[in-house]
Amino acid sequence: FGENVFNDSVMQERLPKKVYKELKRTIQEGKELEQSIADVVAHEMKEWAIEKGATHYSHWFQPLTGATAEKHDSFISAPKSDGKVLMEFSGKELVKGEPDASSFPSGGLRATFEARGYTAWDCTSPAFIKKDATGTGAILYIPTAFCSYTGEALDQKTPLLRSMEAINKQALRLLRLFGNTTSQRVTPSVGAEQEYFLVDREKYLKRKDLIFTGRTLFGAMPPKGQELDDHYFGAIRERIALFMKDVNEELWKLGVSAK
């Protein structure tokens, strides 16, 4: 469980005690992370990722397009005179990135070169490793927020983080009124939808309504509605069981406690 996640136990094991303590302080209290601390964290994160087979890293964020966005950069720097290369990853590269915001829809309101967007490392979410599109390589994913030059949220995560901070502030205020003087933080829990429909790819590609809208817009009702046992409590077919086995294993590797 969590073998592909740079989680708290990995950080505690690999980071110097002072660095680990400062990073935890940043995570828990929202304090600014010093550059020297970020450099050490970046180095250990890179070494851990390389040991896991990663060659690239990505600032991973959720823009307002409804999908995730990522830009892959290699750990390998320019070759030296002897032809050898260095595997580098600095604290500056960890903490902040500058993807081109002109890659996203703007309605033509701004010139391309003025569409500035910045990714900022969200250290409250652990970095993780996933296989690349070929299935043979691996990429270090660094969860980030995506903001404009003046601080406007350009993604789904920034409003979530700000909402969590607002809830924390007011919940702590209420706890103090009730006499609780020990709690330091209130953290809400959010999760993905627990119910979904699994459709065979061959059948899915024949249904334009599913492709374009994600739901059924036409088709006949079942002969008996839902009176039979072929829906929620039907027998699980072998292909579906194997699919769920793969899903569970991949989620567990990423530290997701799928039920």
Language-model features: locations:
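Histidine/acidic residue-rich metal-binding segments in metalloenzymes
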Residues: 2-90, 95-114
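Glycine-rich, acidic/polar active-site loops that bind/position phosphate-bearing ligands
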Residues: 116-259
